[in-house]
């Protein structure tokens, strides 16, 4: 009988020792999962080069390589010509266009287009200089330009909004993963106010893929 009690005591001691060793791990709070934006009704994920974005499901991606001329014309509304301080934003478009397409629900005569461009050369340029460059491009039409700094989580974005006569656009500029990003929505001025919240939502939803570390 005494032998049985001794064995039971030894077993309990071993069990307590094992439990004590594992206790820190059991008490550890698991790391919360990384939040992923949940699409609102009618919004879907679109994949681009090094990024993804939530847009209305009526958007349709186009082949940027087949439409470089149209992309250049679109981008020059924001950048200006080759004498602009930020003209290098139009360089290497074939590799720097991250997404290009349009909203098929908009009238064909005045489509809403979306162009997303990334650029490494301009990543070090201060946003203040980009603001000055945009004003320089617009010249006497600067009065039709509105500039605002927005914060979407950890992302600080400068939004340029321009509308005059039949020309309108909202451009979102920010820096992430060693690149300057420009998200440019082209739409008639009458549509800017109605779509602004959707544009903001889409830019806030963007997920930028980490850039690969160069191999030494």
Regions found by a protein language model. Give the residues of each.
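Structural recognition of the beta-strand scaffold that forms the well-ordered cores
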Residues: 159, 181-184
